[in-house]
């Protein structure tokens, strides 16, 4: 089944709008001085005021927003990381396994022999970091975090001092050595499977910019390979730093392969979903052999991180009995059913060391799943949630012992006054491993608007220390998100992450805000649109009432009109004050000159003469 847009990017393709350059922007690349073979992408927003420098922003959209790039989804993206792995010389080619038969769904047309570690020399990013080795990936992400700057941004120390980072240690300038040290300590990860050479690496940790994940994936009730690839490109256009493919419908393997070969961002999955599909959807038939086979299959494809629900233990399940909403995690409910039907401990918990052994062969990172997360504010911070978190802390230590990178997943639904306790407990329990949270949603009354209530909690927990925020779309609890929902969810979460970065005192976070504030005060409407997260959306709103080109230079908008615009009035006040100040200054100079002449023109006066002089009724001294 060949899709038209997979063959070419025609103007009618679902990807046409996702691959156009951003208005008023250009794609730029930085080459680190200590690794000039690397090419790190950014976006620069060009401003209309010649006195304003271009504003550089992070850009996870890969080549899709580069007008110089040729996009061919059937060929996939350039495999630039392949040379990095080859230069290390510690991997070996394996035969791999044939792709499963998935009916008439079209497989990705190209095949590649998978790689895996060759020996016990350092291979994962964590092992390299502990050995004191700075990898290409570490240099790459340091350049990304600095937006390509060779030194700290002006005023960095003041911004750091002005923020409240709750114990985080953001540097004024991110160096590759700082990245290495954070990874070695387990406080950060670079998800980068050796079999995902198309990847543009990113770093996840609380001492770096807060990242955003977008979930995509088909279901038994809808979507297609074409739709999911389009959602991938759409999500990263609006700022998703990683993407999880949570497909549970048909052609899970083929869908994932198309996504991986065309993804410049890390891809995560929940292997349990495909394992369940392999046993016909019957959770009681799951076993280690099926799960192991699924893990290896996805490692060989190039998945960068796995959600593993190994913390759902048999003894924890009764703790959920009194909950308002029970177990709301798909993975958690599947494993709870397995545990109860067999009356055995979770086989993922029992075989966790074996899972570590598999993941370290490919440098796949753990995302330890929160299968017992609260699904309502009534259940927040309960015994079941924290019992699982304690288990995840112990499993984090086990994964580190095996040289595996780890982040830990978190809730969920948590009211605002209980959010910080989640962050504090995770840091203490999990040794400061990066926290990756779904929201949390701060109230349960927002069906259709859960991207808003969850972004409130996301901004707070991001400020408190969460390293990556998993987006929620308006369709949460209601249905499978489409492209419009993906965009709304990503933008809501980019706002939350950015707000957290500013509050933490990130040195460069506020530069974009300051630029848009100056543009707003100067009535540079096009600059305002282009500096925002959604330039097209902002322009469309302005066009609804002021559509003509002349309106883009007007000193008012339709909210206030020309006579009630506060910024226009502020300009008038400022201009008048400056003119008045000049007049007052001249009057004062004239008066003092007259006083000097009245004193006889003497430069030195005795005390009695000074006391005789007065200006505006005040003594002269």
UniProtKB/Swiss-Prot annotation:
InterPro entries: ThiC, ThiC-associated_dom, ThiC/Bza_core_dom, ThiC/BzaA/B. The keyword Lyase applies. Substrate binds at residues 215, 244, 273, 309, 329-331, 370-373, 409, 436. Catalyzes the synthesis of the hydroxymethylpyrimidine phosphate (HMP-P) moiety of thiamine from aminoimidazole ribotide (AIR) in a radical S-adenosyl-L-methionine (SAM)-dependent reaction. NCBIfam families: PRK09284.1, PRK13352.1, thiC. Belongs to the ThiC family. Zn(2+) binds at residues 413, 477. The lineage of its organism: Bacteria, Pseudomonadati, Pseudomonadota, Alphaproteobacteria, Rhodospirillales. GO terms for biological process: thiamine biosynthetic process; thiamine diphosphate biosynthetic process. Homodimer. It is an enzyme of class 4 (lyase). GO terms for cellular component: cytosol. Pathway: Cofactor biosynthesis; thiamine diphosphate biosynthesis. [4Fe-4S] cluster binds at residues 557, 560, 565. This is Phosphomethylpyrimidine synthase. Its cofactor is [4Fe-4S] cluster.
């Amino acid at each position: 089944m060949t899709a038209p847009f997979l063959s070419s990017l025609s103007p009618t393709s679902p990807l046409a709008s996702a691959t156009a350059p951003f208005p008023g922007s250009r794609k730029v690349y930085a080459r680190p001085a200590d690794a000039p073979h690397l090419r790190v992408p950014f976006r620069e927003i060009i401003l209309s005021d010649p006195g304003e420098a271009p504003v550089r922003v992070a850009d996870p959209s890969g080549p899709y927003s580069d007008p110089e790039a040729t996009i061919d989804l059937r060929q996939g993206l350039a495999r630039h990381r392949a040379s990095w792995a080859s230069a290390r010389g510690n991997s070996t080619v394996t035969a791999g396994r044939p792709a499963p038969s998935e009916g008439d769904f079209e497989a990705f047309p190209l095949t590649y022999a998978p790689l895996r570690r060759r020996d016990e020399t350092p291979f994962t990013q964590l092992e390299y970091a502990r050995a004191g080795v700075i990898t290409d990936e570490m240099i790459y992400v340091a350049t990304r975090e600095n937006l390509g700057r060779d030194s700290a941004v002006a005023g960095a120390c003041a911004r750091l001092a002005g923020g409240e980072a709750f114990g985080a240690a953001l540097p004024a300038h991110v160096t590759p050595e700082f990245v290495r040290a954070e990874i070695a300590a387990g406080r950060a990860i670079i998800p980068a499977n050796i079999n995902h050479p198309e990847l543009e690496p990113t770093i996840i940790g609380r001492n770096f910019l807060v990242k955003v994940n977008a979930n995509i994936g088909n279901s038994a009730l809808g979507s297609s390979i074409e739709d999911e690839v389009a959602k991938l490109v759409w999500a990263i256009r609006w700022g998703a730093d990683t993407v999880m493919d949570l497909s549970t419908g048909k052609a899970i393997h083929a869908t994932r392969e198309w996504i991986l070969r065309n993804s410049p961002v890390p891809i995560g999955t929940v292997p349990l979903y495909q394992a369940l599909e392999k046993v016909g959807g019957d959770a009681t038939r799951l076993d280690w052999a099926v799960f192991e086979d699924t893990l290896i299959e996805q490692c060989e494809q190039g998945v960068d991180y796995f959600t593993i629900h190994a913390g759902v233990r048999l003894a924890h399940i009764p703790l959920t009995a009194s909950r308002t909403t029970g177990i709301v995690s798909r993975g958690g409910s599947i494993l709870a059913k397995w545990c109860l039907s067999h009356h055995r401990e979770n086989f993922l918990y029992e075989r966790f060391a074996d899972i570590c052994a598999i993941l370290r062969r490919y440098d796949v990172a753990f995302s330890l799943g929160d299968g017992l997360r609260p699904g309502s504010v009534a259940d927040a911070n309960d015994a079941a949630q924290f019992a699982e978190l304690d288990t995840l802390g112990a499993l984090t230590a086990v994964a580190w012992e095996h040289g595996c990178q780890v982040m830990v997943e978190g809730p969920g639904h948590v009211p605002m006054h209980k959010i910080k306790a989640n962050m504090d407990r995770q840091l203490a329990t999990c040794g400061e491993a990066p926290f990756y949270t779904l929201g949390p949603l701060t109230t349960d009354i927002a069906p259709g608007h859960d991207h808003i209530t969850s972004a409130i909690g996301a901004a707070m927990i991001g400020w408190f220390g969460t390293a990556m925020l998993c987006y929620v779309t308006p369709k949460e609890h209601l249905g499978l998100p489409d492209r419009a929902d993906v965009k709304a969810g990503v933008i809501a979460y980019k706002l939350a992450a950015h707000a957290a970065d500013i509050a933490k005192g990130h040195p460069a976070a506020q530069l974009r805000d300051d630029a848009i504030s100056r543009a707003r005060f100067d009535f540079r409407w096009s600059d305002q649109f282009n500096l925002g997260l959604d330039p097209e959306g902002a322009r469309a709103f302005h066009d609804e009432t002021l559509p003509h080109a002349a309106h883009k230079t007007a000193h008012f908008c339709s909210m206030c009109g020309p006579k009630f615009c506060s910024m226009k009035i502020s300009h008038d006040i400022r201009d008048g004050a400056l003119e008045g100040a000049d007049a007052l200054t001249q009057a004062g100079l004239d008066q003092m000159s007259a006083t000097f002449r009245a004193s006889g023109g003497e430069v030195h006066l005795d005390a009695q003469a000074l006391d005789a002089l007065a200006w505006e009724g005040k003594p002269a001294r």
